[in-house]
């Protein structure tokens, strides 16, 4: 199986909230460097995606602003693809895992009705991400998997 984070997206992100998510993600990217160097980074009006730099890479994390269509990969992994989109990212707890957790925390904080998350990890695994998000983004997030 492996160490994996999961999320469900129920709708597209509000434009202003997405812009805030991208801005926070850019700040977080700077904060995790150099311990977590990122590769193949896209933080745009349409998508946030990244991986670790080889050999500290695993699966690419991808979050789309718009609701992905039902025919996307993983669409068959849930009962009703018209209701939500399921995705996951196996990080093997490599250094970029911290950034994956941070983006999921911020996304859920900004749009809790749009995205929910779950994890194979324990609360203690997520505490560094919670602390970093709260410090860098001036938010008050907590570990609250709700998927």
Indicate where each model-derived feature is located.
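Acidic (Asp/Glu-rich) sequence patches and key acidic residues
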Residues: 1-147
